[in-house]
């Protein structure tokens, strides 16, 4: 899978750009705040219709312009696709091969993209929000059904919270039941994904760290008390919501559930958030991203497009070398942003394209 060209109009600080990409490595360099990450964000939007920066549609449109337009050309197994995404007051509208897209399923998968950002480097030592967000994004990269389920869960959560905010029990049981059902399916998919990639994380961690430490992933739900753990499926979440109902009515919000769960990154049975060195934490996250790429390649019979957002500055020379060796062997298309080209390990890479980004202007070199 390759992105061969992209056109950007009135997007963030990029007024207009047309960029032709190399099929292997593409390096975008320049000072901070010039538009490098916006190019990666545009590619990601053309694959998922979502921003990896948690931005709302108005945030994506250039100042004093009515809308933004992204167009990309992608190729897989010799078959080309033209993808267009309109971003405006009316929301987001997509076309594939110049035909309007009415179902997300018709848009999803034309560009399979994985993002690796400094935010993810930090998630091993951060609070649960970053790890949960990473997990959700990793799963829906290969499972459209998970994305739809995630939307459904949060729609139900919003409705239930509205009732709780009013302090009303009328109709609460109905929303609680639906939320528990969707939440159970969400948790099952999360735990299933972690079970799939854990052996890959273990393998890549050993290759990076060069030791015998055993890496592991543990989903950490709120179902921690013996009376809840002993229950199965939806009954467990119903019991959890029931146990906290008085508190939730008092606070006006849902305080437990999959939207509050966490994932533990573990080495030799110890959670690295509290017991791991910075080097161990960074090696673990690097192994996790490698596992995500490997998993998607197996799932789709083709590696995804990788978007590396200023990662070279976050990794030491050895881990940078580990990552670049992995990417060379994968034969995948890679987009790299950096403020300092000298930090990249491009030796041995036969072909790559370089671009300088300044004040929203992208210049090929």
Swiss-Prot record:
Listed GO MF terms: ATP binding; single-stranded DNA binding
Gene Ontology CC: one annotated term: cytoplasm
Annotated positions binding ATP: 30-37
Keyword ATP-binding: yes
Entry's Gene Ontology BP terms: DNA replication; DNA synthesis involved in DNA repair; double-strand break repair; SOS response
Subcellular location: Cytoplasm
Disulphide linkage map: none
Keywords for this protein: ATP-binding, Cytoplasm, DNA damage, DNA repair, DNA replication, DNA-binding, Nucleotide-binding, SOS response
Pfam family membership, one: SMC_N
Cross-referenced PANTHER family: DNA REPLICATION AND REPAIR PROTEIN RECF (PTHR32182:SF0)
Family, as annotated: Belongs to the RecF family.
Described function: The RecF protein is involved in DNA metabolism; it is required for DNA replication and normal SOS inducibility. RecF binds preferentially to single-stranded, linear DNA. It also seems to bind ATP.
Protein name: DNA replication and repair protein RecF
Species: Geobacter metallireducens (strain ATCC 53774 / DSM 7210 / GS-15)
Upper lineage: Bacteria, Pseudomonadati, Thermodesulfobacteriota, Desulfuromonadia, Geobacterales
Gene: recF
């Amino acid at each position: 899978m390759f992105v061969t060209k992209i056109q950007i109009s009135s997007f963030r600080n990029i007024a207009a750009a047309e960029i032709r990409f190399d099929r292997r490595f593409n390096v975008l360099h320049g000072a901070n705040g010039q538009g490098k990450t916006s190019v990666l964000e545009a590619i990601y939007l053309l694959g998922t219709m979502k921003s990896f920066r948690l931005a709302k549609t108005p945030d994506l449109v250039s100042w004093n312009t009515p809308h933004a337009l992204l167009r990309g050309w992608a190729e897989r197994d010799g078959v080309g696709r033209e993808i267009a995404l309109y971003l405006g007051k009316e929301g987001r509208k997509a076309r594939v091969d110049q035909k309007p897209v009415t179902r997300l399923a018709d848009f999803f998968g034309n560009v399979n993209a994985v993002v690796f950002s400094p935010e993810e480097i930090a998630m091993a030592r951060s609070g649960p929000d970053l790890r949960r967000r990473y997990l959700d994004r990793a799963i829906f990269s290969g499972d459209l059904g998970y994305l739809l389920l995630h939307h459904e869960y949060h729609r139900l959560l919003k409705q239930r919270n509205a009732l709780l905010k009013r302090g009303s029990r009328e109709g609460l049981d109905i929303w609680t039941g639906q939320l528990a059902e969707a939440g159970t399916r969400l948790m099952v998919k999360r735990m299933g994904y972690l079970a799939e990639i854990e052996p890959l994380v273990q393998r890549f961690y050993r290759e990076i760290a060069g030791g015998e430490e055993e890496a592991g992933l543990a989903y950490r739900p709120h179902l921690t008390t013996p009376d809840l753990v002993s229950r199965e499926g939806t009954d467990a979440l119903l019991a959890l919501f029931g146990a906290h109902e008085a508190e939730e009515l008092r606070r006006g919000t849902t305080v437990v559930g999959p939207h509050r769960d966490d994932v533990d990154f573990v080495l030799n049975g110890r959670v690295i958030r509290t017991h791991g060195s910075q080097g161990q934490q960074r090696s673990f996250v690097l192994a996790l991203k490698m596992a995500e790429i490997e998993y998607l390649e197996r799932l789709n019979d083709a590696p995804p497009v990788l978007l590396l957002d200023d990662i070279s500055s976050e990794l030491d020379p050895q881990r940078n070398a580990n990552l670049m060796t992995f990417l060379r062997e994968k034969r995948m298309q890679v987009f790299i942003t950096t403020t300092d080209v000298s930090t990249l390990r491009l030796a041995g890479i036969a072909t790559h394209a370089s671009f300088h980004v300044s004040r929203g202007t992208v210049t090929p070199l």
